[in-house]
């Protein structure tokens, strides 16, 4: 099942290399290796595959490549076993392209897709890794501690520094984002406050 992954990797590479902010933050890796992993399905995979609100002007190819590969992905459940409820676990979508439980590995980067349906809240959380979001389709409000809220749509960029608490929320539109990490890959995100709902 190489074909959807190879197409997705090449499409992500093209988008990443063309975006100076992404390249400055974390250059697209040159040490990529294939790796074996087991697919793992969650309901968010079906939601993303059937989503009709992921509108984009510039990133349709990458959006579609993430959707095409999603039936074969290992969907993450980062917050399982926390105070996060079933709604979040069933509707928040994230799977890896580069990193653990992903089709490719690199020593310098982690890369995922994140999907959230409309009217969805991703609670405040933080992690040692530095992070950058590129909004591919739809829109969301991004919040960072001690910063004004920012509503971003397709093409918008958001950077989170190490251990900076941040959250996201969608309203009338869903969102899909290409997300990369640099440095400090070993620690998973943790909830900052007990505000999950």
Predicted segments — roles?
Residues 2-107:
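A short, N-terminal "cap"/entry segment at the start of jelly-roll beta-barrel domains
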Residues 91-93, 110-112, 131:
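A generic structural signal for short beta-strands and their flanking turns/coil linkers
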Residues 100-102, 120-121, 164-166:
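Short beta-turn/strand-loop junction motif enriched in small, turn-promoting residues
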């Amino acid at each position: 099942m190489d074909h959807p992954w190879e197409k997705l990797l090449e499409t992500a590479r093209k988008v990443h290399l063309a975006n100076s902010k992404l390249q400055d933050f974390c250059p697209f890796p040159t040490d990529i290796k294939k790796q074996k992993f087991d697919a793992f399905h969650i309901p968010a995979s079906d939601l993303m595959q059937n989503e009709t609100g992921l509108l984009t002007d510039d990133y349709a190819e990458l959006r579609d490549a993430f959707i095409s590969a999603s039936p074969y992905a290992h969907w993450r459940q980062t917050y399982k076993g926390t105070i996060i409820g079933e709604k979040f676990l069933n509707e928040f979508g994230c799977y890896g392209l580069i990193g653990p439980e992903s089709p490719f590995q690199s020593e310098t980067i982690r890369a995922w897709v994140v999907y959230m349906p409309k009217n969805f809240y991703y609670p405040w959380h933080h992690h040692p890794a530095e992070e950058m979001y590129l909004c591919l389709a739809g829109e969301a409000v991004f919040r960072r501690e001690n910063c004004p809220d920012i509503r971003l749509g397709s093409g918008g960029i958001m950077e989170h520094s190490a251990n900076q608490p941040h959250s996201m929320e969608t309203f009338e539109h869903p969102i899909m984002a290409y997300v990369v990490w640099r440095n400090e890959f070993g620690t998973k995100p943790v909830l900052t406050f007990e505000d999950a709902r």
